[in-house]
Amino acid sequence: MQVESTLFSHPKYWAECFGTAPFLPMSRKEMEKLGWDSCDIIIVTGDAYVDHPSFGMAVIGRMLEAQGYRVGIIAQPDWSSKDAFMQLGRPNLFFGVTAGNMDSMINRYTADRRIRSDDAYTPGDVGGKRPDRAVTVYTQRCKEAFKDVPVIIGGIEASLRRIAHYDYWSDKVRRSVIFDAKADILMYGNAERPLAEVARRLAAGEAIADIQDVRGTAVIRKEPMPEWRGMDSRKIDQLHKIDPIPNPYGADDVGCANLSGPSDAKIFDNDAPKPISVQPPRPKPWDKTYVLLPAFEKVSEDKYLYAHASRILHQEQNPGCARALFQPHGDRGVWVNPPAWPLNTDEMDAVFDLPYKRVPHPAYGKEKIPAYDMIKTSINIMRGCFGGCSFCSITEHEGRIIQSRSQESIIKEIKDIQDKVPGFTGVISDLGGPTANMYRLGCTSEKAEKTCRRLSCVYPSICGHLGTDHKHTIDLYRAARAVPGIKKILIASGVRYDLAIEDPAYVKELVQHHVGGYLKIAPEHTEEGPLSKMMKPGMGAYDKFKELFDKFSKEAGKEQFLIPYFISAHPGTTDEDMLNLALWLKERKFKLDQVQNFYPSPMANATTIYHTELNSLKNVKHTSEVVPVPKKGRQRRLHKALLRYHDPAGWPIIREGLIAMGREDLIGNSPNHLVPPEGRNERGPKWMKDANQGQKALTRFSGNQFDERKGKGDAKGKPSASKPKGPKSGANAPQSQQPKTSRPGAKAPFGQSGFKGKAEQGKAGQNKAGHQGRAGKASSGRQQAK
C-alpha cells in the first residue's frame, strides 16, 4: 500500500532548540541539566524505561522528541496517590499513558487467573510494580494531579479495549476502556502517525475536544460524526442505511419537476451546443461511512450480538476500506475512526534510526531487566502480520499490512549494536518481528490490498494475490552475515512454515545458516476441530516443512531439531482432540515443559468464541455453529496434563479422563500405553509432594527427550544451542497413528456435568495440508505496543 511520507515532514516545534536528550528525563534534576523548565509531553508507562526500539515508551518518546517536543518519562509510578504523577510537573500539551509492552492483566496473572510473582519488564524481575488495569489507574491519577491537562491513552492494553469487550479476569463484558479511564483520546495500533498529528494540533492551540477525526483514534461522542453516512448493524441478519443515499454525482437540486425527463425539443435538437461537464468521482462505499454497532448494554446480555459486533470490528481493520464504528454506551458512545495509514519504508527507517542508547536508564543501576536481556541484541525488521491466528491480537493491533524496514537500515542497526551494547559477543539473537518470514511480503494487487476484508491472507488457503517469494529475506540474511565482526545471525521469531514451504530456497537458507540447534515453530494442534477455530493449517504443512528441514540439515551436516509449540484448552477442542495430540507427542517422544493453556486476551477472535461459544469466524446468524469450549477448571487442567503426559503430577487426572472417554486401554506399563496404572505408593505424602512440584522445566521441552530418541532414556541435560546431541530431527519417525477413541459406553467430555454420551472417533494423523496464519502472542515482548 503506497503511503505518502508525512511523519517527519512537518515543521518542528519551537523546543527543538534544546537538542536531543541522552536519555529522556525521569526526574526534575535531569530536566534541569537539559535546561528545561517543563515538559511538553509526559509519557506514563507500566514498564521500566529502556531506551531501545523494542520498548514502546522509547519509540514514542524519541519520535516526539524528533518532532521538537520535550518529552519526559514517568516509569512504573506509585499509583497509591497522585504525587508520583506530579514529579515532572505539569506537561504543556498532554499526558500519554500506556500500560507498557504487555497488557497489565496478562502481565500480572497466569492463564489460570493466578497472580504472577515476577515481571520481566521490571528491574530485578519483581512483580507488583504496576496495578491491575494500569491504563485506567494511571489515567485517573493523571487527571487527579492536573485536572485540565489532556490525557491520551494507547499501547496494547488500550488498543485491544477500544470497544465493549469480554474481560476474562472478571468474566464479564466491560465498557470501552476510554469510558472507565475517562481519557480524552484513545489511540490504537502503532500510533506514531496519529500521535504526531494530535501533538501538532494541540501545539497549534486546538482544543482536545475538537480533535475527533484523526485516523487510528477513538473518542467519546453523544452521536456519530455529522455528514457521515450510517449503516445500521445493531441486529443480526439486518443491515440498512441510516441516512438517505446521496446523489453519487453530487447534485443536490434534483426535484420532482426534474424527474419527468427532457422535452422532445431538447432530445432532437442536435445543433444545440453541448457543454462539456466533468462529474466528481463517485464516492467509495466506505468513504465517510460508519457502522452502528449493537450497544454495550445489548452485547453485555446477548452473546449473539457480542459475536456479531466482534465480527464487524475484525472486518473493519483494512486502512484502505475500513469504515468508522460507533457503539452506544448509555447516552453516549465510542466513535472509532478508521485505522491509521501504515508507515512506509522511509518512515519505518526514520523511526528505528532515532538516537536510542539501547540500554536501560542509568537510574536502574546494575539491576537486571529480563525483557531487555532477552532482546538487547535482537532487531525488529518489520511490523504487522497477515496470518490472522484467532488466538492472537497482533493483527488487530499492528494490522495485516507488513511494514518493512530497508536492508540498509537493518544493517546500520547491527553495527549500532556492535558499538552500543555492552558485552556484545557477535551474535544477533533475532532478525524478525511478529513473524520471521513475512519481511517485504504482501499483496501483489494494489486494488485487492485496499479493498480486502479477509481475516487472513493464508487461511484457509494462501491468497492468489499474496506474494510468497522470500528473495528479500534471503538477501537480508546474507547481507547481515557479511557484516564484519558478526559471528552468527539467529532467527528466534516464529517461522510461518506453511508460508516458508512455498519457497524452499528460504527454508534452505534458514536451516543451513540461522538455526542454533533447534527451531521453534507453532502447529498449535494436530486435530481439525481446534485448528479450524485457530485458523491454523493442518499437519500436512508441518510434515512438508519438517521434510525440508531434515533434508537441508542433513545436507549441511548438522543435527538440528524442530521444537513445536502447542496450545491446550483452545475453543473448539474436545477431550478426544487433546488425547490424540498427546498420543502424537508420545509417538514422537516429545516431552513438553511450560505448556500454555489458552489465554483469552481482549479482542482476539478466539476470545469471542470462548465467551459466546459461537463461531464468529463466519457471519453470525441465529443458526451459527455452537463451538465446544473447555472453560471448567478441571477440564482445562486435564487438557494441560495431557500435553505433559510424561509428568507424574498429571497422571491421576489423565487416568480419570481416559476412563471418562472409555480409553482405559491406554492405562498400563507398556510403551503403547499413555500413563501407568496407579502405584501402591502413589497416594503417599512424599509422592504427592513430588507430584505437585512436577518435573523441572529446563527449556520448553524436557532435557532428555533428544537422547531418548537414541535409546538413552536416562541421559540428562538439554540440547546445546550450537551442537545438540541426538539424531537428526524425525529420524525413523513413525507415521501419525490413528487411535480409536469411539467405543460403546464411552463417556462425555471430562470436566462437564455428568458422564454421558459417546466419545468421538480419533482424528490423529488425518489432517490434510492447509495454509494458515501464524501470529506471535499478544503478550510478546517483541510487539511494538505503544
Curated annotation (Swiss-Prot):
Coiled coil: none annotated. The keyword Transcription does not apply. Residues 679-688, 706-717 have a biased composition (Basic and acidic residues). It comes from the Bacteria. Pfam families: DUF3362 (PF11842), Radical_SAM (PF04055), Radical_SAM_N (PF08497). SMART domains: Elp3. Residues 718-731 have a biased composition (Low complexity). Residues 732-741 have a biased composition (Polar residues). Binds 1 [4Fe-4S] cluster. The cluster is coordinated with 3 cysteines and an exchangeable S-adenosyl-L-methionine. GO terms for molecular function: 4 iron, 4 sulfur cluster binding; catalytic activity; iron ion binding. The keyword rRNA processing does not apply. Residues 371-649 form the Radical SAM core domain. Keywords: 4Fe-4S, Iron, Iron-sulfur, Metal-binding, S-adenosyl-L-methionine. InterPro entries: Elp3/MiaA/NifB-like_rSAM, Methylthiotransferase_CS, rSAM, rSAM_horseshoe, UPF0313, UPF0313_C, UPF0313_N. Its cofactor is [4Fe-4S] cluster. [4Fe-4S] cluster binds at C385, C389, C392. Residues 669-688, 698-786 are annotated as: Disordered. HAMAP family: UPF0313 (MF_01251). Belongs to the UPF0313 family. This is UPF0313 protein SO_0311. It comes from Shewanella oneidensis (strain ATCC 700550 / JCM 31522 / CIP 106686 / LMG 19005 / NCIMB 14063 / MR-1). The lineage of its organism: Bacteria, Pseudomonadati, Pseudomonadota, Gammaproteobacteria, Alteromonadales.
